[in-house]
């Protein structure tokens, strides 16, 4: 046994208990570990650290900061791994357990009752842990670089987000991914790469987040690390770089440790311990301890160096410098090469793979080292995208002064034909710097939580500057200014008040009344109101909200409870924008829409138990859509009435027609007309605004303006009013009262015919657009039944995992009884037939030859698969079915699937598209809905 120079955690002592005993409440807490006292102790400890100069220094140095998330399929071990990370970092004094409901990050009652993660939890800790007195001898990264030591020897601040795995909480994962710099993807060593894992993996690719893979649960019967590695290559579309291989011991293949391919060391954990006692063997010691493992470790090192050499020229040079000996290439060189490949422009061509068993307390510390060594800090992550008015750029370009404000792409074709319209206006560096000199901070609100004690907590990621206490934050989405009276750093459900949140960090603002998920918040020095133009339009890339597919009615127990219920719903919608609330005009019922049955059940529990709303929820139903079948005649409406005591008058002409990508590609798109000033696709509908006679020019600052509009109506509010009017009309179909889908609306507002001077207010214009669009929709239904509207239903992309014995019964049930269409049926589902075609995944797949992937042999397998030799599949090999099935047929499907598969089948699904229903099916659905 030897010391481990690459394992910084092995030489650092945990925080001493004496540190906690300074608290007067701590006398009996270490024996009974009462939950309240434990929470207080953690809070007391971090408050004491926050005052130290060391922590302040750690906050400033972004290169020692990691904003990471844990992503995975449900039950892969995300929360269990998080609890071990907190324990080894010294944040907790005992290991929380999901089954006991004692975890730190799953603190909601519903999470502890169901044993699943519902809400993403943010928590901050240090790895390796700081010493007990709040001072640290942690070396600088420059010193480590000079000594050829890894980054993991220096203590890093880790901001960790534990995300849900259930498909119903996809939005919770999406808004967490939006603010991460890196991620750890956890795989179940028995189940391998599962369907939800693929979906989350490709969602992370959209945000270009570097990821490492941790294969968990290797202690369980049936665990197959080698098979999982091959699935990483075939289903996650990247070359797996095996950085660790599992150490199986004894005749029954008992998992006892790992062999580190980078450092050529063996790590052996004490069975039944808390994971802090580790024996470390060098290669010579490992040959004496387990010769077969040592030989496999050498093969793994050869494969790793060869793989990196194909993607990194520096690794090739190092290989030749060390006499072409794979085993003598320095460990630090391999770490640098892995990091270079992971953070390079072609993100995730190489996927580092690690091994462990979090529940058995094995492999978590090396995983934390990998987070420090491989994943990027905030200063190394991709420059966030922003919009500034109608221009798209990056925040880095704005702050550096290298910014050219370009014309709006939506009106590019118009400008070509109208040479006198808006030209490209380029600001000089001096102009931009003068604008941004007073920009104090820029942050994204990625989550809103209602806390019973602290009020509304707005979680923010600061992208530039420093967000200071009592600063005035301007919301560029809502155009309101609010003061930030209190700032917190969150440790799951515990909070520490701070004076500022620096760039690159995650924190909480308390006291904001209006901020929502996805809003951009900026502050400027010396400004208490609106920032100067165009900074007041600066918006970070928003968080896309997926469309809801289920809905249920919400009714208060009495009329006196109506107000309380609406207030609770408003809080719930600020927390979770993937929920939608609408009012049925016919029945007057309040309808709550969401992503799935479990999603709505949790929302109901939150309303009743957390917000104390005295209300009940009706039966969960499916959200259908309505579509037009033909083009309507032009319908013109003039709105002429008083609004809030002021006369309003405006007009608009609307035409509605079917819309779809296939129709656009056939040349039916009319968006190239010279008079079109706005085009937007939203919720499957397309809205086009044409404004004949509205002459648009651009001033020296790049701002669009028009002298043809009334003085009280600027160009932006002119567009927005018409757009909102059309949106309002599309929210309810004329025949079945479902929201419209696959509908194109063309609005025409002629300056000479439809505008009436000072009487044409924004509200009057919006009302005219709504009336005209509604009239065009009704025009179709009154002409003829064949040219009216039809119904559309959500069709789901369903991925079912069953064993071989149940395959036939499940396929027959899907294709016959449920009217589904089988897309693929294979042991390893091709990525091209599953999630790569979903709107979330826009990354280009990497061509991976599975036969060239190195994977160590699994227990009880005779051939080594180091050279990619095939292994005969077991008789009851898990099979994957991919199908397209109407959502109506999938309601309550889990119980039926379990009866068909003897309780072993699982499935996940997401909305693939909305599809037109046949006349017979539409009639049956309407009869069921009593319409």
UniProtKB/Swiss-Prot annotation:
Pfam families assigned to the protein according to its UniProt record, in alphabetical order: EF-G_D2, EFG_C, EFG_III, GTP_EFTU
CDD domains per record: EF-G, EFG_III, EFG_mtEFG_C
Protein location: Mitochondrion
SS bond partners: none
GO cellular component, as recorded: mitochondrion
Keywords attached to this entry: GTP-binding, Mitochondrion, Nucleotide-binding, Protein biosynthesis
Xref: SMART domains: EFG_C
One MF annotation (Gene Ontology) recorded for this entry: GTP binding
Binding sites annotated in the UniProt record for GTP: 72-79, 162-166, 216-219
Major subcellular location class: mitochondrion
Residues of the tr-type G domain: 63-379
Chain segments annotated as coiled-coil in the UniProt record: none
Homology family: Belongs to the TRAFAC class translation factor GTPase superfamily. Classic translation factor GTPase family. EF-G/EF-2 subfamily.
NCBIfam families: small_GTP
Function recorded in the entry: Mitochondrial GTPase that mediates the disassembly of ribosomes from messenger RNA at the termination of mitochondrial protein biosynthesis. Not involved in the GTP-dependent ribosomal translocation step during translation elongation.
Name of the featured protein: Ribosome-releasing factor 2, mitochondrial
Taxonomic lineage from the root: Eukaryota, Fungi, Dikarya, Ascomycota, Pezizomycotina
Gene of this entry: mef2
